[in-house]
Amino acid sequence: MSEEFGRIIEKGFETWKNNLNIALPFILDSLFSILFVGIVGVAVAFVIGFDTTAQFFDRLQIISMSEGQEMPAVEAVSLLLLIKPYVVHLILSFLIIIIGLFIIITFFEAGAIGMAKAATEKGGTGFADMMNYAKKHVISLLLTELLIGLFLLVGIVFLLPAALLSPELFSGQGGYGVGTLILGIFLWITYMVIVITVLFIAPYILVIESLHPIDAIKTGFGFFVSHKLDVILLLIFTVAIAIVSNLVIGSVPKVGGFISTFVSIIIVQPLTTLWWVRLYMAKTNKPLYVNELLSHPDDLSNEW
């Protein structure tokens, strides 16, 4: 007998309380991401020259702090002229940062899901679980995320009608074209929301079941079809928690942003991962850890 939604939330929270170290992958993710961006930034500054880099930030600060209209425009042109010889370097460094961050985030995401699985299944987890699952599944998880990204890009077809009417958009009679563009954007956003919702659990399934990317996506789709309400409820629930915590904590003067980030890394993200892992494991009748000292007698039959 699978757990009900409320029970999944309750038990997931209990698992988190007993395994606060599940925050480790998210902490390391943040630290390594910052370190990586810093290393690339220093490398770029070394290539283009530290004096040029200092001038870039000085002019950028002038633009951001100036209240007038004329000065920012002048400084903006000056800034563009300053970076023009280094456009290729900047584009290359940007691509390196994007690819590097994608790998770092995916590595620790696989580790976090693996830790959540171990904690849900055995009642405890540790650094070894994170490394084992991360090394084993990082490549497959990267490919899965890329495939889902491609599915999202397919929605660009909704903008094709507006593209065909592009001459009208820039003419004096572009009302119909603008309306088509707005409708296309709306349909694309709707399509992306649907794809994200349907395939949201696929990365978790890949790590839990040790599947290949295509199989993980197929299984994720099948799981959504069988458990639509639970998936949608958990998605709304976790997104609402993230938004509310950011709004409430982020509104604290001066330190709100820092505290909000800290809470997200230490509490919200680990809890969210545990809930999604437990949802799949509970609904597919996977073995779940039972704390016999704290659990109700009925839990033994419900969770095993």
Named regions from a protein language model:
Residues 67-104:
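Membrane-embedded or membrane-proximal helical elements that form or frame transporter/channel pores
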Residues 161-186, 251-260:
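Membrane-interfacial helix-loop-helix connectors in multipass membrane proteins
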